[in-house]
């Protein structure tokens, strides 16, 4: 085992004694502690990994070995500091500051260090526009309405976007800090139908639909939220609301019945059917089909891609219901991938069987990577989101039995 791998495994195991032994056995590692740790996300250092484990003893071992407590991660969009993770435990901020961590304005805002924020901005008003981890601004970190108002009153741009997700503070806050997001809306934050639905604002939802009835089709995907920088990780809505979510799905999930009624009154028959399928509501699917047996023939492009989105979300029940309702089996979604590509990528043998029973093309290409479902299965088994839980052997067996060929 390489020395750096021994250190990596010790940190991953949250074992301070093993970290100390690795550093003692391989003194050369001490000069590399501030470099990106091999295999770590976002250019993370060993010390940042220890902080995320909330392991005081391990932090002290690394500091004694020479790790710089103020070294940020090596991340293109804006490095992360140890204090970015200080919220993980009540004791952590004072512990890290006591060992030399220097708070920046983002940390002071996040930790509600109000007097420190006031002092920093008095000394340098321009700090209200300073960028931190992921290129977020201080306003992105505001946990309370009071802090948000304080920053806005001192020149914070309510619609400024971070670097990695190209998203506003309100978009970051919409689920976990709804009261702050509502305040930002009142103070001029750009609002879309997804945000208004998540925050249960019937008036804004109605106003948006009156101005643009097509807005109801908005979904959390690259079509609606394209990134300007190819390195960007995608809209923060992917994490705060959920990939591929629509306004009706969001309102339903959050229990906003009034918003759901407004949205469903405006939704097309195809959208209503897609939502019923996505929720696995077989009775409602049957009712909708009884009322409109030929609805599948009227699906818009956005509605057709809901099948690919359901496959991307690993929602086998939705895929089955959509196919039974007449969705085209070769609909394409993100990366121009078909549902079978996604089933293969997730190692979902059951979904693959269902799709193939509906004549999904087994050797189809044409996605952004020009790969076949078989190629996606092989890639997913090593790098996929479900590589630890997916049944890739069975999925590949299903594909091969259906005539899948190796990549040419």
Go through the PLM ranges and name each one.
Residues 1-6, 90-111, 119, 178-199, ...:
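Ankyrin-repeat-protein effector appendages
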Residues 1-39, 111-131, 200-216, 272, ...:
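N-terminal segments that cap or nucleate solenoid repeat domains
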Residues 3, 43, 76-79, 135, ...:
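Start-of-repeat signature of ankyrin repeats
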Residues 9-14, 49-55, 82-90, 107-113, ...:
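Ankyrin repeat A-helix N-terminal signature
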Residues 18, 57-58, 91-92, 116, ...:
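Conserved ankyrin/ankyrin-like repeat signature
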Residues 23-29, 61-68, 98-101, 121-126, ...:
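Ankyrin repeat domain, specifically the short helix-to-loop turn at the C-terminus of the second helix
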Residues 30-31, 37, 70, 128-129, ...:
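Ankyrin-repeat junction/capping positions
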Residues 34, 40, 73-76, 132, ...:
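Ankyrin repeat boundary/linker residues
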